[in-house]
Regions:
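Active-site groove signature of glycoside hydrolases
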Residues: 99-118
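N-terminal small/glycine-rich loop or linker at the start of catalytic domains
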Residues: 1-17, 70-83, 109-111, 204-208
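Conserved, mostly hydrophobic/aromatic
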Residues: 8, 25, 32, 40, ...
Length: 236
């Protein structure tokens, strides 16, 4: 895949950070694609399926060859309750369910979502082999893993056959307040694994908007970043 330097993270379409106007959300996706963004990342977990549903509506008028689509398996939710299921069967079922919500007949990149919530042995021995089988059938194009903890990503890469994991997605570790991912760039690149740097603004930490209550940053850092944002605004 030849992806644009900036991609469209569709978690916001699920109202993850704040409530959304669906029409404006759809317009935002269209503007992004028209502006050259060709990689879209989503998950059934975002908004408990809402993000995929809204994204599916937005993609109805976008030619399929204009974008690469990435979604995930493992994390879900219903009626405000978060759930996790990294079993092979649930992973396979989830892929087909996502395709239906998104209105597509294949997924360019399928990720195992936030592997820290699973037994890593299950990820390596059950979840990923199921997704690799879908890759071999042409249902998905590529297979990846995501997590906040870089060490978990490395562990899985070290415990699966070469070529199993084609991409990793890590968030909040390659931004102004945290550059831990830099220490691992060579490791992944030497293994031919693509790197997706998610949340370059640290999920709102480095913005005027501020962070939601569930943000993992310690309160002193939240307050320091808020002061920094106010300082930058004051300086124009």
């Amino acid at each position: 895949m030849r992806v644009s330097p900036l991609s469209f993270g569709a978690s916001s379409l699920g109202g993850v950070f704040h409530s959304i106007d669906e029409n404006r959300a759809i317009e935002a996706l269209h503007v992004a694609v028209e502006g050259g963004m060709n990689f879209i990342d989503v998950s059934p977990y975002y908004g408990h399926y809402k993000a995929e549903i809204v994204l599916g509506k937005a993609l109805r008028t976008v030619p399929r060859d204009k974008y690469y689509l990435s979604t995930k398996v493992g994390r879900y939710g219903k009626d405000g309750v978060n759930t996790w299921d990294y079993s092979a069967q649930r992973a396979v079922d989830s892929v087909y369910e996502s395709m239906e919500r998104l209105g597509v007949d294949y997924i360019d990149l399928i990720n195992v979502h936030d592997i820290e919530f699973a037994d890593l042995h299950q990820i390596a021995g059950e979840t990923l082999p199921a997704l690799v089988e879908l890759r071999e059938k042409g249902v998905v194009g590529h297979v990846g893993i995501t997590d906040l903890q870089i060490e978990n990503l490395v562990w899985v890469v070290n415990h699966v056959p070469e070529g199993t994991v084609e991409t990793i997605l890590n968030f909040c570790h390659f931004c102004l307040c945290d550059d831990k991912l830099c220490d691992w760039l060579d490791y992944f690149e030497q293994r031919g694994i693509g790197i997706i740097n998610a949340s370059p603004l640290s999920m709102g930490l480095l913005s005027e908007r501020g962070v939601p209550s569930w943000h993992p940053a310690p309160q002193p850092l939240v307050e320091a970043c808020s002061r920094a944002a106010q300082h930058c605004k004051a300086k124009g």
